[in-house]
């Protein structure tokens, strides 16, 4: 399968389109046929070598992906082949297929595109977590989101 891998921490020219083996889901994972993948601030930092916890090179980029469940691990019982999901992924979302833990998979509602669902996976959950657990707005308070840029 095709995948985009990072070959060094030297910028965008370090991204390479390569052929790799399709990942196999472990017992609690699903295999996703990727339809959309996000580009996050952390990935941009990683490409430039500024990410605080770099992975060993080369590796497939992409912390999140949306797509169709193509296969199930032996103990993955809460999803079925053909389900539309978005998830933080185990094996890199910039590929034709990626694996994800079933506990991280979020079903995509009817009428929501893969790209739209993907937009809430990391950025949306980060914003929600900061708002609800750090800011903790009260019922009589208002919240202004002035910028949503990385």
Regions found by a protein language model. Give the residues of each.
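Exposed loop/turn and edge beta-strand positions of beta-sandwich/beta-sheet ligand-binding modules
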Residues: 11, 16, 28, 63, ...
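Short, conserved catalytic or interaction motifs in soluble domains
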Residues: 8, 74, 110
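Conserved hydrophobic/aromatic beta-strand scaffold that supports enzyme active sites
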Residues: 17-22, 66-68, 97-99, 105
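Short beta-strand-to-turn element immediately C-terminal to the catalytic PLP-Schiff-base lysine
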Residues: 6, 47, 70-73, 99-102
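NAD(P)H dinucleotide-binding glycine-rich loop of Rossmann-like/cofactor-binding domains
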Residues: 36, 86-148
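Cytochrome P450 core scaffold surrounding the K-helix E-X-X-R motif
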Residues: 42-48
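Glycine-rich beta-strand-centered segment in the early N-terminal region that forms part
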Residues: 21-38, 50-92
């Amino acid at each position: 399968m095709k995948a985009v891998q990072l070959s060094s921490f030297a910028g965008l020219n370090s991204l390479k389109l390569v052929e790799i083996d399709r990942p196999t889901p472990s017992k609690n994972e699903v295999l996703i046929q990727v339809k959309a993948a996000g580009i996050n601030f952390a990935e941009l930092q990683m490409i430039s070598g500024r990410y605080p916890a770099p992975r060993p090179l080369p590796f497939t980029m992409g912390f999140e992906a949306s797509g169709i469940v193509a296969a199930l691990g032996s103990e993955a019982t809460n999803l079925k082949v053909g389900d539309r999901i978005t998830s933080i992924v185990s094996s890199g979302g910039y590929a034709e297929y990626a694996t994800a833990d079933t506990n991280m998979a979020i079903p995509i509602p009817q009428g929501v595109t893969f790209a739209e669902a993907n937009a809430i996976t990391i950025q949306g959950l980060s914003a929600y977590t900061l708002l609800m657990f750090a800011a903790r707005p009260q019922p009589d308070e208002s919240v202004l989101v002035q910028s949503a840029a990385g």
